[in-house]
Amino acid sequence: VFFLTYLHILRGLNYSYLYLPLSWISGLIIFALFIVTAFIGYVLPWGQMSYWGATVITNLLSSIPLLVVWLCGGYTVSDPTIKRFFVLHFILPFVALCIVFIHIFFLHLHGSTNPLGYDTAFKIPFYPNLLTLDVKGFNNIFILFIIQSLFGIIPLSHPDNAIMVNTYVTPIQIVPEWYFLPFYAILKTIPSKTAGLLICFRIITITILTS
């Protein structure tokens, strides 16, 4: 899903969707919701790697007063934390789906950009040409998504997640998922937790301010 999301963002930059602020901002909100939902889903197996991943992230959020106590249900990652994460992981995809419909509405409201860069009276009709291509692409993505969801969860997960949680033993290295690597690199580079969080937040919001 994140591979397709990053491709979609690059396509939007190439086609200058940055100058369609409503479509662009709603897309960035969807991207942020994807990140939060993916992280919460990563924690849900409650294995050794996901537990310590949750510990690291909640420690980062400790720079925001009272947020960690509310999120964890206490002062450490424990059973109330997993219950809160499960509820959020169930709700956030529906929120993202609603914003996807808003995103599509804004796109149809203002129309798409012209990647060819010249004026012409010739228009390619949406039906049946583009609609057929969209349905074909959706079917292909849906098939890949089902295959990954049903058969690829265990092979693509970290072996340490098959180990029962031990709160007294940390993994040799907490390995982030590949789609978190840009944010992980920033947080590793900057010694200050608050500054690292602000820069990660700024990465997502900077394109909102320039749209």
Where do the language-model regions lie?
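Membrane-embedded and interfacial regions of multi-pass energy-transducing membrane proteins
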Residues: V1-S211
